[in-house]
């Protein structure tokens, strides 16, 4: 597979990637009760910076205490959190790789008990629950919306200017707060923040503009899950026009890249259920164009990743492929794919174990990778 375009460079903002395999943002619940990354988080990311020039996208990270709707997920608002992340960033950079922080606000998808324990309400664009029988959020006021935008801006500053991240990814996917404003089944407002395509886009676009003003356009990307029905999304009648408007405005604003979660959320060996036939997001990749990178995520394996880069988008040199679960169990994933080595199986039971390194640090490198590293060390 070493001849595949997966192993050609990709200019990504100010980062020159040496291959197009990207670590997916994945919640792992390995932060302490105050949202500070635990010490072994540094080791986890360093393990996956196994080849110089690798791009790592971190797990979703709360922009503020009120935006943190789950226990043991990290934040980026406190000095302790910033310091914890800076250790991770410095270690990844020392290995010659790059790391971007995903910025996150949960909105109505939060666990109510976590919010109440800190004195916060469940909130969203409108008073519409994720599904019938679920808790109903309170609609954010205009002042609160602007305050949340400010939280995103401060979090981006903390990440890029203080912790040293190469950039930030705005989490506009999977039914979280930005997505809750974008899509009409959730957003039933009639003010400047809802009621039409342009107004539903306003929250995400204003966040993007102001974050770019704070840290620069080469340091800002956006993730979207256009076809996903997760957490009450993906059922709107004007879905394509809504996302077309949003993506075209993002392109005009000048973000560094677009990250799209595909409609296929299953492993490549089990493609039985697809939420939409456009499994490689060709509808929205065409809208975005070829000038800047597009990251594609959604159940890719070695062969399907090669296929999407070398055949589906053979005329698009700025496509990156995002790996999640396979990257958990194969910290040397880029090396394995390049050399055609078999992948280790992952264990779902250990994905989410707070305060534990089980299933987090204990997947070994391949013997071939270890041998190659020893050779390089001797040559150095």
Swiss-Prot record:
It comes from the Eukaryota. InterPro entries: Aldolase_TIM (IPR013785), OxRdtase_FMN_N (IPR001155), Oye-like (IPR045247). Belongs to the NADH:flavin oxidoreductase/NADH oxidase family. GO terms for biological process: alkaloid metabolic process. Substrate binds at residues 171, 174, 352. Keywords: Alkaloid metabolism, Flavoprotein, FMN, NADP. Induction: Strongly expressed in planta but not expressed in axenic culture. It comes from Epichloe festucae var. lolii. Gene3D superfamilies: Aldolase class I. This is Probable inactive reductase easA. The gene is easA. GO terms for molecular function: FMN binding; NADPH dehydrogenase activity. FMN binds at residues 25-27, 60, 102, 171, 223, 299, 324-325. The keyword NADP applies. Probable inactive dehydrogenase; part of the gene cluster that mediates the biosynthesis of fungal ergot alkaloid ergovaline, the predominant ergopeptine product in E.festucae var. lolii. DmaW catalyzes the first step of ergot alkaloid biosynthesis by condensing dimethylallyl diphosphate (DMAP) and tryptophan to form 4-dimethylallyl-L-tryptophan. The second step is catalyzed by the methyltransferase easF that methylates 4-dimethylallyl-L-tryptophan in the presence of S-adenosyl-L-methionine, resulting in the formation of 4-dimethylallyl-L-abrine. The lineage of its organism: Eukaryota, Fungi, Dikarya, Ascomycota, Pezizomycotina.
């Amino acid at each position: 597979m070493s001849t595949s375009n997966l192993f050609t460079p990709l200019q990504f903002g100010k980062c020159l990637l040496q291959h197009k395999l990207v670590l997916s943002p994945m919640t792992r619940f390995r932060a302490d009760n105050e949202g500070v990354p635990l010490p072994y988080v540094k080791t986890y990311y360093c393990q996956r910076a196994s080849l110089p020039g690798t791009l790592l996208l971190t797990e979703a990270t709360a922009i503020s205490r009120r935006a943190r709707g789950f226990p043991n997920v990290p934040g980026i608002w406190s000095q302790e959190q910033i310091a914890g992340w800076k250790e991770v960033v410095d270690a990844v950079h020392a290995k010659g790789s790059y790391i971007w922080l995903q910025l996150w606000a949960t909105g109505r998808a939060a666990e109510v008990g976590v919010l109440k324990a800190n004195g916060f309400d469940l909130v969203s664009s409108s008073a519409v629950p994720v599904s019938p029988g679920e808790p109903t959020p309170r609609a954010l006021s205009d002042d609160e919306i602007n305050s949340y935008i400010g939280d995103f801006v401060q979090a981006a500053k903390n990440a890029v200017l203080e912790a040293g991240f190469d950039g930030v990814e705005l989490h506009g996917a999977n039914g979280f707060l930005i997505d809750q404003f974008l899509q009409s089944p959730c957003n039933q407002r009639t003010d400047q923040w809802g009621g039409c395509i342009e107004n539903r886009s306003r929250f995400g676009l204003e966040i993007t503009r102001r974050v770019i003003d704070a840290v620069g356009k080469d340091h800002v990307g956006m993730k979207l899950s256009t076809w996903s029905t997760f957490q009450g999304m993906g059922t709107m009648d004007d879905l394509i026009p809504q996302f077309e408007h949003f993506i075209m405005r993002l392109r005009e604003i000048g973000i560094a890249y677009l990250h799209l979660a595909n409609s296929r959320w299953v492993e490549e060996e089990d493609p039985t259920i697809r939420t939409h036939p456009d499994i490689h997001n060709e509808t929205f990749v065409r809208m975005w164009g070829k000038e800047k990178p597009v990251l594609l995520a959604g159940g890719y394996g070695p062969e399907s990743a090669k296929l999407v880069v070398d055949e589906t988008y053979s005329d698009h040199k700025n496509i990156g492929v995002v790996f999640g679960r396979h990257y958990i169990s194969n910290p040397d994933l880029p090396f394995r794919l390049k050399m055609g080595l078999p992948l280790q199986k992952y264990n779902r039971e250990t994905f989410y174990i707070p305060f534990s390194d089980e299933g987090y640090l204990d997947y070994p490198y391949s013997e071939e990778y270890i041998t190659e590293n020893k050779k390089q060390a001797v040559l150095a």
